[in-house]
Amino acid sequence: TLTETRDYAVVTDHPQEVREILEGFEADWHRQTFAPGNDARMIWCPINGRDRIARFIDESKHKLVVQNERYQDAVILERLVRAAERGVKVHVLARPPHTLKKDKLVEGVGGLRILDDVGIKIHKLKGLKLHGKMLLSDDTAAIVGSINLAPGSFDSRRELAIEVRDPDVVERLRKTAHHDWKHSHPLDLSDQGLMADLEDRQAGAVDRLALGTGSGKTSKPAGKNSKSPVKKRSKGAGKKRSKTAARRKKKS
């Protein structure tokens, strides 16, 4: 982990934050209910995580950097889309689809494609495995913790994050985020790109993404010297399909 993955840790000596962490640990250890209250400084799941992160995104005015393993929560995806549509420059760092768990593959790819469709830039790290969870807004505030942007993390697990505004800490995070983006590749979310990324997966992975030929057999991923039977996905394809379906329905 120390040499092969991108991870983060924040040290705090703020009395309320330290007290919250201790109280949360003791409650969990003794299997008791933990309620930090509306004035909680820490970001807790499954208590206030989704609301706090959604609000953080909503407050971003110019630039938002997001590093996370999973992009699957509908509320957070909507907030990221809204941010892009109001002119915020959004940079998303994600893990390649082939690293996702098999039962999370469709959700994970679907979430990334939603972001891609509104023009959000999505990259993958070179040389490091992305494990850290970090949001950086306007180079002035950040959220660092263990929360994946997925319903399971927000609703079913004990996850913890901290919001930081200390200039020195934020600057270190900014430099790291800048370095990671500079040393990253655009993530190809086209049908051909996904099939190429999944080529090392077991048989059936491509069919689960509905990228096969429709024969019920697994399609061979597109390699450098192979021709894919699937056309490259284009933006706006979903709208064309919807209009075609509507015309058919009207005729019938």
Describe the predicted segments one by one:
Residues T1-M42, P46-D51, R55, E59-S252:
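PLD/PLD-like phosphodiesterase catalytic module centered on the HKD motif
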